[in-house]
Structure formats: C-alpha cells, structure tokens
C-alpha cells in the first residue's frame, strides 16, 4: 500500500541527494511523478539488425522521460530505501536520467562545466566500453551490466553505484569515481564505512 505523504517524502529525499551541493534549479523539467504499486509492463518498439522494427513487452521498475515525467514502482522504491548499500536504487537511477536530459538529450552527458567535457567524455567512454566488454563475457562487475545498454543507462547505473557502493566503485573504477565526485560535488565514501557494504559474487574487475 502506498502512503501518499510518506511516499512523496521518501522519493523527494532520495531525488534531492543528487542535488545536495549544486546551485542548480531543482529538476527544472520535472512535471509529474507517477507511482505504480509494483513493476509494470510497457510496450517498446526496437529496431532489429535486419532493419525490421519489432514490438515487445518489458517489465520495468521505472522510467524517465525527457518531457519531465518520471514513473516509479513503489515496491522497488521501498526496496531501494531499505538497503542503501546494494547498488540498486530506482529513484537515483530515474532522477539521474532527469539530470542527463537537462542537456537537451539523454546521452550520458548531463550539463557540465565547460572545462570538464573533455575529461568526462574520455573517462565515461573508456568505462562504458569496458563494461560492455565485461557484459559480453558475462563477468561480474561492481556496476550492474544494465549500464552497458547505452551511454544514458551507463550514467544512471554509475550514479546508483556511486551513491550506494562508493568504496567499491572507487577501488575498481577510480577515474570514473572522480568524475562523479566532481559532477555531484560530494564524496559518498564519507557516508559509508568501508567494509560495511557487500558485493554479490566475486568481482572480476
């Protein structure tokens, strides 16, 4: 059961983590948040390698649209808040997409200071390609391999990992971690005692 006041406070609190040390407007494009009780189904059209467009059904935990609409599964919002050290948080993920969209397109490059674009592009491209390769090899990594889908998902998954598993991300992808520290203007390692988090399986990174 969704309790409206508690639910909106929880979502707002987690979404505002991404803005803590920034002087930005508070999600200027955000227009609405739709909450479903649990994971929901959507129809998506995908272009196949042979040029044929195929429609398929997907179960999703959340969505973020460039027009400012965010959709969330309440079950997964609660799960993310219950364990803030597992690297999975649908609120952080979808609101990272909202930040990304502020540049005019959702492509893994949110609005940045002019002198940081070159470094951001280099580090994110290298780490994205590395995650794609590890995903193809079915290797366990500190980041969820859903981030290998495209650059936009890479940024959203990197944001989840940055806030929830900062020590692990720093140990295995230090340059990526530093870029996220500069972007978000904070260091979540100060919030998490090292060794308190856990990782599923043995990481190959």
Language model features with spans:
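Catalytic glutamate of the conserved HExxH
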Residues: 87-90, 94-103
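Metalloprotease/metallohydrolase-associated module, dominated by Zn2+-dependent proteases
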Residues: 12-21, 25, 40-85, 102-205
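A general secondary-structure junction signal
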Residues: 35-39
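Extended, charge-biased low-complexity segments
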Residues: 31-33
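Intrinsic-disorder/low-complexity, polar/charged segments
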Residues: 1-4, 149-150
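Short, basic and Ser/Thr-rich N-terminal targeting/leader segments
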Residues: 9, 27-29
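Short, structured protein-protein interaction patches enriched in aromatics and acidic/basic residues
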Residues: 3-14
């Amino acid at each position: 059961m969704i309790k409206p006041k508690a639910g909106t406070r929880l979502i707002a609190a987690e979404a505002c983590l991404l803005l803590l040390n920034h002087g930005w407007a508070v999600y200027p494009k955000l227009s609405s948040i739709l909450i479903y009780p649990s994971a929901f189904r959507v129809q998506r059209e995908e272009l196949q390698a042979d040029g044929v467009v195929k429609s398929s059904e997907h179960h999703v935990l959340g969505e973020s649209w460039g027009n400012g609409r965010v959709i969330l599964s309440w079950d997964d919002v609660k799960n993310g808040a219950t364990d803030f050290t597992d690297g999975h948080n649908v609120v952080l993920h979808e609101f990272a997409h909202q930040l990304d969209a502020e540049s005019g397109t959702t492509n893994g490059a949110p609005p940045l200071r002019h002198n940081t674009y070159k470094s951001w592009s280099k580090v994110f491209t290298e780490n994205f390609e590395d995650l794609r390769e590890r995903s193809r090899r079915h290797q366990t990594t500190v980041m969820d391999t859903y981030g290998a889908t495209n650059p936009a998902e890479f940024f959203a998954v990197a944001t989840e990992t940055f806030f929830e598993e900062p020590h692990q991300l720093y140990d295995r992808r230090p340059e990526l971690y530093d870029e996220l520290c500069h972007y978000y203007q904070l260091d979540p390692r100060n919030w998490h005692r090292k060794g308190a988090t856990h990782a599923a399986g043995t990481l190959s990174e």
